[in-house]
């Protein structure tokens, strides 16, 4: 066949072209289109898939790393919490102990103050008793001296004079050198 016959077979104006109606295309045209698409797009698609796979793997690695960091921070926070709870418990116990000691110290100080106050009270009472006794003693002695003075100022009676002489004689007879 020559070239003219081929041109004569083909209707004018139709020529080679792409049939865009899929239902009218045959399997060969469809296979050719799929082959061309796979050939040109397949490489780009496989590159895109590899890039996507690499991105997903990187994201998984980063997620695992962040998860391990988060777990490590969680463990550190847990340790810090336990340490803080232990310190709080120690502080609470120490506070309770100090409160007890302070209470006991205050109670002991109160007892000592009561003892000192009682001693001071006794000393004060004793001082005022001694002062009162001294005043009474001074009063009695001054009265007695006053009465003696009055008796000396009065003339002595015979009976009193005889009593004194008898007393002095009795004392002298008792005296043995």
Curated annotation (Swiss-Prot):
Q: Does the keyword Thylakoid apply?
A: yes
An annotated Gene Ontology molecular function:
proton-transporting ATP synthase activity, rotational mechanism
Q: Which top-rank group of organisms is this from?
A: Eukaryota
Q: What's the main place this protein lives?
A: plastid
Coiled-coil annotated residue ranges, if any: none
Question: Sorted alphabetically, which InterPro entries does this protein's record hold?
Answer: ATP_synth_b/b'su_bac/chlpt
Annotated Pfam families: ATP-synt_B
Q: Which UniProt keywords apply?
A: ATP synthesis, CF(0), Chloroplast, Hydrogen ion transport, Ion transport, Membrane, Plastid, Thylakoid, Transmembrane, Transmembrane helix, Transport
Query: How does the entry describe its membrane topology?
Result: Single-pass membrane protein
Q: Where can this protein be found?
A: Plastid, Chloroplast thylakoid membrane
List residues traversing the bilayer: 22-42
GO cellular component annotations, sorted alphabetically?
Answer: chloroplast thylakoid membrane; proton-transporting ATP synthase complex
The family annotation for this protein states:
Belongs to the ATPase B chain family.
Biological role stated in the UniProt entry:
F(1)F(0) ATP synthase produces ATP from ADP in the presence of a proton or sodium gradient. F-type ATPases consist of two structural domains, F(1) containing the extramembraneous catalytic core and F(0) containing the membrane proton channel, linked together by a central stalk and a peripheral stalk. During catalysis, ATP synthesis in the catalytic domain of F(1) is coupled via a rotary mechanism of the central stalk subunits to proton translocation.
Supply any other comment: In plastids the F-type ATPase is also known as CF(1)CF(0).
Task: Describe, as the record does, how this protein assembles with itself and its partners.
Answer: F-type ATPases have 2 components, F(1) - the catalytic core - and F(0) - the membrane proton channel. F(1) has five subunits: alpha(3), beta(3), gamma(1), delta(1), epsilon(1). F(0) has four main subunits: a(1), b(1), b'(1) and c(10-14). The alpha and beta chains form an alternating ring which encloses part of the gamma chain. F(1) is attached to F(0) by a central stalk formed by the gamma and epsilon chains, while a peripheral stalk is formed by the delta, b and b' chains.
Protein name from the UniProt record: ATP synthase subunit b, chloroplastic
Species this chain originates from: Oedogonium cardiacum
Q: Lineage in the entry?
A: Eukaryota, Viridiplantae, Chlorophyta, core chlorophytes, Chlorophyceae
């Amino acid at each position: 066949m020559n070239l003219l016959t081929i041109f004569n077979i083909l209707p004018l104006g139709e020529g080679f072209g792409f049939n865009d109606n899929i239902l009218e295309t045959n399997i060969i045209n469809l296979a050719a289109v799929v082959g061309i698409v796979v050939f040109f797009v397949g490489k780009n698609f496989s590159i895109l898939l590899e890039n996507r796979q690499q991105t997903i793997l990187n994201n998984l690695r980063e997620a695992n790393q962040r998860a391990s960091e988060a777990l490590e921070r969680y463990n550190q926070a847990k340790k810090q919490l336990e340490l803080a709870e232990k310190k709080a418990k120690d502080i609470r116990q120490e506070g309770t102990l100090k409160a007890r000691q302070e209470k006991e110290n205050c109670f002991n100080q109160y007892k000592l103050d009561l003892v000192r106050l009682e001693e001071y009270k006794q000393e004060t009472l004793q001082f005022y008793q001694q002062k009162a006794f001294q005043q009474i003693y001074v009063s009695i002695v001054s009265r007695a001296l006053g009465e003696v003075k009055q008796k000396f100022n009065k003339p002595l009676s015979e009976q009193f004079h005889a009593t004194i002489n008898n007393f002095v004689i009795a004392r002298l007879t008792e005296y043995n050198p």
